[in-house]
Amino acid sequence: MTPKLIVALDFDNQDNAIQLVEKLDPNHCALKVGSELFTLLGPQFVKALVRREFKVFLDLKFHDIPNTVAKACHSAAELGVWMINVHAIGGLKMLQAARESLKTYGKDRPLLIAVTVLTSFEEGELASVGISNTLPEQATHLAMLAREAGLDGVVSSAHEVKIIKQKCGENFITVTPGIRLPNNLKDDQSRVMTPQQAIREGSDFLVIGRPITQASNPYEVVSALLRDL
């Protein structure tokens, strides 16, 4: 069974990342590698995590012309990762190209999910980029586009999970960032929830980064989260 907890390795150096990884159990959590760490350490770091038998979510949010995104997704799959993502706003053709690029992997292909609306966005900010929808409307619209393209699910705030599940089906995966512990500040995330709240809303996987990586004892935080989940 795949763990619900995805620990975001939000570090700016390899030593700190490895120190935490060595304390984690691949049976208890998956790991997320984002743009910062991937740019710093590259594919070999991802492969090293896979060799440790961790499920790796490669969070690079591909968004480009369809051919480029398809090739990027194929390259990501070559690393043996469990999950990759693209920006849903890239459109139906881009999403379909990403999906098609993974067909050769059959049942061993990574999960392909689409980013809807970043959890740093606040209500009203979409207008600044020319979108008149509300946050829930836009997230739901993009989730339905991802489902039409044949993707496995989406990244979305927990606030939109219920409506996405209603529109796209209970088996449509929802991966939820913006998870904060009750005593944490929101920092640059606007639409946040606690782990327990997100699970109640129906989130399938919770991405938790800074509450873990910035803690004085990250492993204690992980252990407490696992007990709660």
Curated annotation (Swiss-Prot):
Pathway note: Pyrimidine metabolism; UMP biosynthesis via de novo pathway; UMP from orotate: step 2/2
Role played: Catalyzes the decarboxylation of orotidine 5'-monophosphate (OMP) to uridine 5'-monophosphate (UMP).
Q: Which domain of life is it from?
A: Bacteria
Catalytic residue list:
K61 (proton donor)
What protein name does the entry list? Orotidine 5'-phosphate decarboxylase
The UniProt entry's GO biological process terms, in alphabetical order, are: 'de novo' pyrimidine nucleobase biosynthetic process; 'de novo' UMP biosynthetic process
Q: What are the binding positions for substrate in this chain?
A: 10, 32, 59-68, 119, 180, 189, 209-210
Please give the organism.
Legionella pneumophila subsp. pneumophila (strain Philadelphia 1 / ATCC 33152 / DSM 7513)
An example of a Pfam family matching this protein is OMPdecase
One Gene Ontology cellular component term attached to this UniProt record is: cytosol
- Acetylation keyword on record: no
Catalyses: orotidine 5'-phosphate + H(+) = UMP + CO2
State the PROSITE patterns in the record.
OMPDECASE (PS00156)
Q: Which InterPro entries match?
A: Aldolase_TIM (IPR013785), OMPdecase (IPR014732), OMPdecase_AS (IPR018089), OMPdecase_bac (IPR047596), OMPdeCOase_dom (IPR001754), RibuloseP-bd_barrel (IPR011060)
| Broad enzyme group | lyase
